[in-house]
Amino acid sequence: MPNRSVENHLSVRSETTLSWAMRLKIAQDAARGLAYLHEGMDFQIIFRDFKSSNILLDEQWNAKLSDFGLARLGPSEGLTHISTAVVGTMGYAAPEYIQTGRLTSKIDVWSYGVFLYELITGRRPLDKNRPRNEQRLLEWVKPYLSDRKFQLILDPRLKGKYQLKSAQRLAVVANRCLVRNPKSRPKMSEVLEMVNRIVEASSAGPRTPEPPLNDVSLETARERKRRIIDLRSGEKFVWS
């Protein structure tokens, strides 16, 4: 692909920084791709190795899923899962799959949630070059999910050029994908609907950076209360 993979552009060595609008579009394209694999055909395909290096960008910066080497057909009618040897990439694999080898489409949903935090933070899911307490992305972001601290996890390479509300809402979607119980995770078609709403709201909103969280002069009390409730409802779904 002309513009390589998402992983390439999230790397600190990359000369190109993906804008926030581009990251939202990538999240949307990737969700659409997974939803099609899971629900758009007469048979189901489980990607099984969904990660940023397998999401390629074409000349128009549209995201395309690639490398289906580990993909498997979903369970036959009447079955809930497939039992397989555990394969995939550390940092993206769902905990129940690692523990049992039981394969369902919900492992892709988990991996997608990890990927959303990768887009938000610009960090790899597992990076042993960082300090010990920052090596695992999901563990590192946990203390910052509250309203006041959220900005601290946003990719510094964005240099403040992002829409804070859309980033917070994307994190809520990620949290719903990262529910410990796979049956409680949404289907990818439902995830796509959530991401579509975020993209639509972002397109209608301002392109400039939003004010700090402690500056409430530009939002009503009702809007602020709704935003806090949205974040807290998302935190209930966190993977702990």
List the predicted regions and their residue ranges.
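Structural motif in protein kinase domains
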Residues: 1-13, 149
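Activation segment of protein kinase catalytic domains, centered on the conserved DFG
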Residues: 13-28, 161
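Activation segment
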Residues: 100-105
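Intrinsically disordered, low-complexity cytosolic regulatory tails
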Residues: 164-169, 173, 180-240
